[in-house]
UniProtKB/Swiss-Prot annotation:
Keyword Cell inner membrane assigned: no
Protein name as catalogued: Uncharacterized serpin-like protein FPV040
Coiled-coil region list: none
Family classification: Belongs to the serpin family. Poxviruses subfamily.
Transmembrane segments: none
UniProt KW Signal keyword: no
Organism, as annotated: Fowlpox virus (strain NVSL) (FPV)
Alphabetized SMART domains for the sequence: SERPIN
Alphabetized GO MF terms: serine-type endopeptidase inhibitor activity
UniProt keyword annotations, A-Z: Protease inhibitor, Serine protease inhibitor
Amino acid sequence: MDIIKIQLDVAIKIYNYIKSTGTENIIIAPCSIISSLCALSKLTDHSTADKIYDILNIECQNIDLYMKKINDNMNSSDIDYFCKLGLNNVCINQRTKNILYNCYKTCTVDETEGCSIKFKNVLEFEALWNRPFTAPTEEQIRKRHNSVEIVSILVDAKRRLHMLRRLDNIGCSVVRTSLASNRYILTTISPNEDKEEIFNLLENSINVDSLLDWIDNSKMKKAQHRLKIPKIKMSSSYDIVELLKSLGLNLMEIKFSNVFPETTLFVERIAQSSIMEIKAESISLNTDIELEFTNNEYPKINCSSCSETVVGKPFIFILQCRVTGNCIYFGVLRDSF
């Protein structure tokens, strides 16, 4: 299995759905979502598990090994990653507990109240820029929907080497820079001119093959460049139940055949919430993913949303581990006020 292809495919499926709801700023943690759904599959009946693997395009024969490779890489000095499975009035056997812990970094705890089955996946990432931004920020005035806001743009004090590529066919550029003493790579893709129609063309060009092409180091060159990125703090939250249903995975009612006693439960909520902050010294992203199942037939209503944010020129970003290539985050940011 091609790990990065699977992760980008999941990210794009989620991105396309969230964009269709009218949400403008989108932050996705594909590894966390894949891990959460695959951990859930260890408790469900075979039919549901197979549907999960199908929408993720993952071979079920190697699923535990695949997830172990991802999750072993998800804890470091820059990443804090863990998942908790809370069980109320049900239990699982020791073999399943061991698989969840060793391959999915999921510890199992007994709960006395609340949902019958609840997964909570937490990903906290913070990395220093290889070179902090020391120059004064550039203030930009942004006008949108008859409103005016000001954004502070972090700018390198002097030119330095980055990996660059011009996408002349769509009027955009790709910039790759290293984080945390070269342990991670941040790729940004943005229009050369601050025009909405160019960014719309860029967004419409997003697919797995195009992203893999854009981040291909062999097609880039080292060049002197001043990195510019907005100084922001923003939040986003997405409902995943309807997204999964649109992909053919209906989790509204699930048979849990690998818990004792065997039971059928209804979804309470499946949601991802993220906070992103970009500062002169570092970049941080924190994400919670919750999957809750109860006897209640009526789920909570969770709407996709993002905080009002001003970012200046819009851009796509991809955050990867340099060694493994894992796509830790994928996002699209634009003014939303």
